[in-house]
Amino acid sequence: MNISSIQEQILKLKKEKDVCILAHSYQAHEILEIADYTGDSYKLSVDASKAENKNILMCGVRFMAETCKILSPEKTVYLAQPIAGCSMADQMDKQLISQVKKMYPDYTVVAYINTTAELKTICDVCVTSSSAVKIVNNLDNKNILFIPDCNLGDYVAKQCPDKNIKLLNGGCPIHACVNVEDVKKAKELHPNALVLVHPECTPEVVAMADYVGSTSGIMNYAKKSDAKEFIIGTEISIAEHLQYECPDKNFYGLTLKLICPNMKSTTLVDVYNCLNGNGGEEIKLDDQTITDARKCIDEMIRLG
């Protein structure tokens, strides 16, 4: 079957089986086209909780599907591609952070939403890249342990100078691989383009940007800006999606190194097979994990 034929079958099956399809912004455009909701990980989780469907199919990575299950425990949640993990989320586990917490007993543990459900159970509050600065500023405690992304943590620390923020060595290996030379080369090729980067990039790269923000922030900025050319410093698919949505502007990926293999592991065929009962994986979390992990997400909503 060609792409359009598979898409037609998917649309038919999701209606028959009462499935809401969620697709992260880093997914291929052909997957976004069959999704009920698209966006970043937290937005998709909220969308899932509001959807009337009994079944949720996540086209993204495992921690995103887990977050959907935490926010919608009464629903059946599937991950379209079981091997789609997240290198950042897998860097730190509950055992490690439990030991670190003993070293910093008076610190509030702030966890990027890109963490496992198990790790969320021992954290005080979750944040997204778009809400991190606001939430950290709103915390009563001056002492913060920010996990797992040290680059995002560094960005937050610079925006929150009154806070004492402790960082651990972790983060997104894809965003972290971008260097100053990559930015210089991109600007040489496109001297009139604005540089928009994600705060998961290194501090040196962030310092060279015209705008720093979350995936949704980058997309909104580019759409609303009067500028006509943009260098996009996040997963390469965002430049592709923006080019599709704004054909009167030009978008350039900062570097071809910005390709997330985990996000790219999900295909239309995976979605089709999952809906057919021949693929995917149901996300199962025990009641205690859901209850404990939900606390830091609820705190994020309260402070954000």
What are these regions (language model features)?
Residues 1-232, 238-304:
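Active-site loop-to-helix "anion-binding N-cap" substructures in soluble metabolic enzymes
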